[in-house]
UniProtKB/Swiss-Prot annotation:
The keyword Transferase applies. It comes from the Eukaryota. It comes from Oryza sativa subsp. japonica. One of its GO terms (cellular component) is cytoplasm. Residues 259-269 have a biased composition (Basic and acidic residues). This is E3 ubiquitin-protein ligase SIRP1. It is found in: Cytoplasm. InterPro entries: RNF126-like_zinc-ribbon (IPR039525), RPABC4/Spt4 (IPR029040), Znf_RING (IPR001841), Znf_RING/FYVE/PHD (IPR013083). Induction: Induced by salt stress in roots. Induced by heat shock, drought stress and abscisic acid (ABA). Residues 248-280, 296-323 are annotated as: Disordered.
Amino acid sequence: MAEAAITRYWCHECEQAIEEAMVDEIKCPSCGGGFVEEMTDEEIERLTNRQPEPGFSQWNPIEHPGETMDSDDEDNDLGREFEGFIRRHRRASTLRRVLDSIHDDLADDQERDSSILINAFNQALALQGSVLDPDEGQGDQGGSTNDDGLLEEYVLGAGLSLLLQHLAESDPSRNGTPPAKKEAVEALPTVKIEEVVSCSVCLDDLEVGSQAKQMPCEHKFHSSCILPWLELHSSCPVCRFELPSEETKDLNEPSNIGRVEDSHEEVRADGPGNVSESSNRPWAIVPWLNELFSTREAQNAGGVSTDQQSPHTSGTNPNAGHS
């Protein structure tokens, strides 16, 4: 009498054949799992001889959880690098907007027009008479110079912190209108708010029935907001209407801007001396922020003659020849 055929199973959890007869419950006697499948001898032989690639088993995340964690760590590292790139891009965009805003303020007052002096060889910035050298305090770097320094390196590279520090420590009146006269500030009327409007300084609403200071342009602000503002600026924060301003400088005293543009000796990093067009460390004058983000202009800044950039540097009188 022929023997009854033995039913064979394949355990998908421990990936081995099961030949023992199971009566009560079909499960793997080795691992106790119930994920078993009845198969023919050919199918079991094929599965037995198969060599799965490491990391591609369907149970690999369960059998080797550490590998999944490593993969997650790599994904997290990539995510952090991407977030860092986004943050740097946002900081650059924010800096650009700040500089553009400063440029707009300076453009409103022709008497306070400023300029940047860029040394394309030793990577130093001269802003309104102050020399900012990114390599200052870092010791001797072998005396080498960078002939390919671009303006972006000053703004977004080593000179970024120096530029921000200069802007933060500068006199606020240089970056806008001068302070308003105390008499003009004291003469501002205090009005009663009849409809809800927004204070443009703190962006909070002026409640109906409350008291507020009104500028001659009829813009209204909290007293605690507009009075400190007028101690630094004489213009309206909304429309830039100007009140009479305090004159804090002697008209006969030359300004820092004049010294920067009229004298190379005061801004040269290598000290006083005769300055000639054949100097191996030339300065090029670039209008304040107009060419700040122009790669081509910054790259060629070292080869531009200063007397072609500004009539002040060459000592030429722009009104010469006119009676």
